[in-house]
């Protein structure tokens, strides 16, 4: 005798709550997303679909965004969203380049690290763009010339790079070496050997850290030009399953990262890694950034990523759903390549997909009294 199927009461509070979660909890449960095309709407056309996977972002102190794309060709673009601007301008399509690993804003120039050549990933640079007078009344940009610094290390792919403001240089890694690029001299210098894996980050003191095997971080101090291998021990977790990613809190320099299982941690040079802060709904953890009140926003999961928020004041990780923009035109966001914090605390995500957009996320404003702690608890 077959077992009788259990009947569900679709009018029960439990069933209604589940239906509500499925219906209204799949997409953007908190805050507002705006998907912005890679153009000046109404005045120019976006970067073509198979060249517009946004994989690298950075921002100047004034809040001007620079980015790089991957695909059939790599492009470098500038984006402005404050004042009377509201546009993305394609600065250059780089012939031969198919992958942009990083863009780094210096005091006067932006450097892009691009791959696609047999002799190794190269660095190209151009002057920063000034804030235009008024993009409503008049709009005039010229595509600037780019200078090619050459390969970062001959025969090796560039993995990632970050700006080092104190010396106005760029520190990066290839598949086997640590290097610096100096805009003042247009020179690239090899600083040592490191395993080229995942992304690197700048700490509160200005040191650069990156993954050193599956159990440690290496550390490079630009001021003393000293490289320490196996400088910091990683906490318990799965650190070889997904590329290492970071988010940096601008005010304190506190870093956030995640292991391959979606476990979140913070890192402070003096105190080491925190205890586990929480776990994301999906894995692996993708790009993330920290807004001004200390909350961390990012994406997790492959192909159909969901947004998450870690709130240090509440000490919890929440699932915010799949990215959806409903302002002016409807667009769903599934895969993202990088993230950066904007001038006013909004988070800007680069969509790593055909016809990629810049997604501006405006977090929910906290209620009065919902303060933020100075630092998350750390293991001493």
Model-derived segments and their meaning:
Residues 37, 87-93, 134-150, 189-193, ...:
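Beta-propeller fold detector
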Residues 22-50, 143-147:
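A short helix->beta-strand "capping" segment at the edge of beta-propeller domains
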Residues 332-380:
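Blade-level signature of beta-propeller repeat domains, shared across WD40, Kelch, NHL, RCC1
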Residues 80-84, 128-131, 182-186, 221-225, ...:
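Short loop/turn segments that connect beta-strands within beta-propeller blades
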Residues 65-67, 110-113, 169-172, 207-210, ...:
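Conserved beta-propeller blade signature
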Residues 72-74, 116-120, 215-216, 262-263, ...:
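Short glycine/acidic-enriched loop and turn motifs that connect beta-strands
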Residues 43-74:
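Beta-strand-rich domains and repeat architectures in extracellular enzymes and scaffolds
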Residues 51-57, 96-104, 148, 154-162, ...:
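Repeated scaffold domains used in trafficking and secretory/extracellular systems
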